[in-house]
């Protein structure tokens, strides 16, 4: 499985309240959540993001409250994956559970800039900054996690395997 897109670049400690502000948690509709994704840190995000685009961030992405709405809003906005130095553990699990690929790779994060074209091979963990012509080895997901992501998340995986 691969993804390719333009990069949106953010710093440290992007918390779930910034990813999807609490004032929008009165809905679980993914498209409505996507319309407000990142708006407190990047007001034009929802109008600029295109299907396949990639978020790259520094340390502790997804910290803060444990809300599944955060990775849902990112995925529904069209973002194909998030690459960061590190993720808050609960965000990491929530992202996998809803089928949003996330990769830790400090070497890539140190080089990739906003607007760069990046390609990610989830099977191998290779992250390529196409703009700069550089590749980095991220941590590939174990096969079972790749299966969950390919199924669109844990619920979809369970529904498909129970039939």
Swiss-Prot record:
One of its GO terms (biological process) is nicotinate catabolic process. GO terms for molecular function: 3-isopropylmalate dehydratase activity; dimethylmaleate hydratase activity. Highly active between pH 6.5 and 9.0. Retains 50% and 10% of maximum activity at pH 5.0 and 4.5 respectively. Pathway: Cofactor degradation; nicotinate degradation; propanoate and pyruvate from 6-hydroxynicotinate: step 7/8. Keywords: Lyase. SUPFAM superfamilies: LeuD/IlvD-like. It catalyses: (2R,3S)-2,3-dimethylmalate = dimethylmaleate + H2O. NCBIfam families: leud, LEUD_arch. Belongs to the LeuD family. LeuD type 2 subfamily. Heterodimer of a large and a small subunit. This is 2,3-dimethylmalate dehydratase small subunit. The lineage of its organism: Bacteria, Bacillati, Bacillota, Clostridia, Eubacteriales.
């Amino acid at each position: 499985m691969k993804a390719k897109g333009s990069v949106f670049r953010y710093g440290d400690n992007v918390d779930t309240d910034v990813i999807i502000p609490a004032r929008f948690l009165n809905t679980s509709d993914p498209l409505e959540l996507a319309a407000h994704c990142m708006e407190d840190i990047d007001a034009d995000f929802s109008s600029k993001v295109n299907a396949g685009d990639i978020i790259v961030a520094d340390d502790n992405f997804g910290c803060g409250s444990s809300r599944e709405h955060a990775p849902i809003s990112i995925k529904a906005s069209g973002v194909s994956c998030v690459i960061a130095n590190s993720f808050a553990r609960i965000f990491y699990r929530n992202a996998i559970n809803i089928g949003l690929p996330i990769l830790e790779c400090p070497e890539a994060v140190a080089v990739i800039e906003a607007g760069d074209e990046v390609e990610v091979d989830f099977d191998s963990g290779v992250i390529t900054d196409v703009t700069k012509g550089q590749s980095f080895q991220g941590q590939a997901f174990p096969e079972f996690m790749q299966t969950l992501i390919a199924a669109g998340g844990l619920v979809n995986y369970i529904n498909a395997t129970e039939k």
